C-alpha cells in the first residue's frame, strides 16, 4: 500500500509543479497521515528524477487512440484489397503460432 500512497503523492507534486524529491514525497504522505518507509520515497524519487510525470501520463493517453485510428482509416482509404491482405496476414500469423509446438491444449 505504501507504493500507492507514494504514487499519489508524486501525482500531487507533479500537478503542483513541484520537484519530486524524497523529502517532498514524505512531507505529503505525513500530511495525509500515512506512515511510509523512507525507502519507498527514495525509490520513487530516483525513478522519477529528471522526468516530467505530466508528459509521461499524457503520452499514454495520446498513444492508444492515435495508433488505432490511423490503422483503421488507412484500411478504409485503401479499399477492400487492403482488408483482404490484412486478413491473409492474420491467418498466416495464426498458422505460424500452431507450428511452434507451444499449444497447451493440442
Swiss-Prot record:
Residues 69-82 have a biased composition (Low complexity). GO terms for biological process: cytoplasmic translation; translational elongation. Pfam families: Ribosomal_60s. GO terms for cellular component: cytosolic large ribosomal subunit; fungal-type vacuole. Residues 83-100 have a biased composition (Acidic residues). One of its GO terms (molecular function) is protein kinase activator activity. Keywords: Acetylation, Cytoplasm, Phosphoprotein, Ribonucleoprotein, Ribosomal protein. Residues 69-106 are annotated as: Disordered. CDD domains: Ribosomal_P1. The modification N-acetylserine is found at residue 2. It comes from the Eukaryota. Its main location: cytoplasm. The modification Phosphoserine is found at residue 96. PANTHER family: 60S ACIDIC RIBOSOMAL PROTEIN P1, LARGE RIBOSOMAL SUBUNIT PROTEIN P1B. Component of the large ribosomal subunit (LSU). Mature yeast ribosomes consist of a small (40S) and a large (60S) subunit. The 40S small subunit contains 1 molecule of ribosomal RNA (18S rRNA) and 33 different proteins (encoded by 57 genes). The large 60S subunit contains 3 rRNA molecules (25S, 5.8S and 5S rRNA) and 46 different proteins (encoded by 81 genes). The 5 acidic ribosomal P-proteins form the stalk structure of the 60S subunit. They are organized as a pentameric complex in which uL10/P0 interacts with 2 heterodimers, P1A-P2B and P1B-P2A. The 4 small acidic ribosomal P-proteins from yeast can be classified into two couples of similar but not identical sequences. Each couple (P1A/P1B and P2A/P2B) is distinctly related to one of the two acidic ribosomal P-proteins P1/P2 present in multicellular organisms. Present with 22400 molecules/cell in log phase SD medium. Belongs to the eukaryotic ribosomal protein P1/P2 family. Component of the ribosome, a large ribonucleoprotein complex responsible for the synthesis of proteins in the cell. The small ribosomal subunit (SSU) binds messenger RNAs (mRNAs) and translates the encoded message by selecting cognate aminoacyl-transfer RNA (tRNA) molecules. The large subunit (LSU) contains the ribosomal catalytic site termed the peptidyl transferase center (PTC), which catalyzes the formation of peptide bonds, thereby polymerizing the amino acids delivered by tRNAs into a polypeptide chain. This is Large ribosomal subunit protein P1B. It comes from Saccharomyces cerevisiae (strain ATCC 204508 / S288c) (Baker's yeast).
